[in-house]
Amino acid sequence: LNPDMASLRASVAAFRPFLEKDLRERHGIEPLAMYVYPAQVLFCKQPLTRLADLAGRRIRVSSTGQADFVEALGGTPLRIQFAQIPSNLEAGHTDCAITGSSSGHTLGLHRVTQHLYPFPVTWGLAIFGANKTAWERLPADLRQLLGRELPRLEERIWTAAESDTAQGLACSTGARGCKLPSKGRMTLHPLSSEDERLRLAILKTTVLPRWLQRCSMDCAQLWNSTLGAARGMALPER
């Protein structure tokens, strides 16, 4: 759904009003900020020039949505803990791993894989919130201070996540823009227009329909009134 940071910002802006209202009214949480982590990309041992090359490969994933995406490409998704990714790759239990571009480099995946595909399969998002009752008991001036400063912190985190995504790619491939002492020699394979079309097709035919099957509420209507409207992707409502 979000092939770049600009798309992710648009998606969050479309869904955030519902999310914040639901957190307050249903869960008693006052949402204060939303953070993002660097893009989740593909580290592979074998050459990877297009998404179709993932067919038949065993690929580490960290979410159900990622697993649906991999299965649609003909790959086998495997749930493996983050710290165990290198050993599984070295032992031949997995062929590729989907993880953060920055955290993957920190973990040393540039030492056990040779090919890097920078397509953001997913992004990690986190919410910073407070118990609503406790929040309302805070002094008004403190709430005003937090309400003013936390959005600034949020924006700095988003900017850092975009920078860290680029740094992870640069350092794993040994590009000149890398600012870290550890540099890899991975081959970077850019996203093609063919893969952009395939990404959208899988989202519409596999990832979204499976998500809709798992959802316990009328998610089609929610999707259509938020993300679907913003991104031009309507789902059939029940």
Short names for language-model regions:
Residues 2-23:
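A gly/proline- and charged-residue-enriched helix-loop-helix capping module
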Residues 1-5, 24-238:
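N-terminal secretory/targeting leader peptides
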